[in-house]
């Protein structure tokens, strides 16, 4: 099974922060911060750690099912 899960960072006006998401592994936001690049780097670290833990504990990897749709204003 492939381990390239969808990861993205989104600005939250409500929180006034960037929030990092990986919907197939974590419910809701996994990390947050004011610097978009740092949030993405932290998200990648969290995903890698979670996948290593699952492998070490012989847990099955979740299916990659996340789909992101964007509404584009014209």
Regions found by a protein language model. Name each.
Residues 10-26:
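Short aromatic-glycine-(Arg/Gly/Cys) micro-motifs in beta-strand/loop hairpins
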Residues 1-8, 34-37, 41-74:
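Short, charged, surface-exposed hinge/linker loops at domain edges
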């Amino acid at each position: 099974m492939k381990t390239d899960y969808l990861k993205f960072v989104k600005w939250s006006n409500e929180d006034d922060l960037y929030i990092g998401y990986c919907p197939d592994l974590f419910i809701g936001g996994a990390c947050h911060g004011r610097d978009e690049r740092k949030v993405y780097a932290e998200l990648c670290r969290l995903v890698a750690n979670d996948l290593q833990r699952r492998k070490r504990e012989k847990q099955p990897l979740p299916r990659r099912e996340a789909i992101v749709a964007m509404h584009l204003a014209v």
